[in-house]
Amino acid sequence: MNREEKKELVSELNSLFGEASACVVTHYKGMTVAELEQLRKGMRAAGASFRVTKNRITRLALADTPFEGLADLFTGPTAIAISKDPVAPAKVCVEFAKKNEKLVILGGAMQGNVLDKQGIEALAKLPSLDELRGRLIGMITTPATRIAGVTQAPAAQLARVFNAYATKEEAA
């Protein structure tokens, strides 16, 4: 890889770090290509990406980004999981690491806050942004639905009383 390609890669990674809200740093030593592809597939499904990068290039790309504090983690065979969703890369990495001991989570960051391995595991237990939005909308619409039901109930009860009275009159 020549100097121009390296500069281009640093620029690409820097913009990727600038747009992301979460990053997880992992060691992948001993994993097969098939296992890495399976992990990448899981990341794509969650809206994240998993990349193996050169440590020096990644450290350079971290400059002037919210993830600058992660530079010390880049030693040995490292890979990054990155996403705009703050929970997605952590969830996929933790889930995959439970099944495959070769994937070691070193740490990560979320919106500028550096997290250790335990922090990433705690982050993985949180619901995703879409799940939280769904819950919030459910909480907002539930009272309106109940109010509509309560306001319609007296009219329905009154209609049933009139109907019962009418059928009683017809029967008599």
Curated annotation (Swiss-Prot):
The cross-references to Gene3D superfamilies, in alphabetical order and at most eight, read: 3.30.70.1730, 6.10.250.290
Q: Does the keyword rRNA-binding apply?
A: yes
Check the record and name the InterPro entries matching this protein. Ribosomal_uL10, Ribosomal_uL10-like_sf, Ribosomal_uL10_bac, Ribosomal_uL10_bac_type, Ribosomal_uL10_CS_bac
Task: Give the molecular function GO annotations.
Answer: large ribosomal subunit rRNA binding; structural constituent of ribosome
Q: Name one Pfam family in it.
A: Ribosomal_L10
Q: Which UniProt keywords apply?
A: Ribonucleoprotein, Ribosomal protein, RNA-binding, rRNA-binding
One biological process GO term for this chain?
translation
GO CC annotation terms, alphabetical = large ribosomal subunit
Q: How does it assemble?
A: Part of the ribosomal stalk of the 50S ribosomal subunit. The N-terminus interacts with L11 and the large rRNA to form the base of the stalk. The C-terminus forms an elongated spine to which L12 dimers bind in a sequential fashion forming a multimeric L10(L12)X complex.
The record's comment on protein family reads: Belongs to the universal ribosomal protein uL10 family.
**Function comment:** Forms part of the ribosomal stalk, playing a central role in the interaction of the ribosome with GTP-bound translation factors.
Task: Name the chain's protein.
Answer: Large ribosomal subunit protein uL10
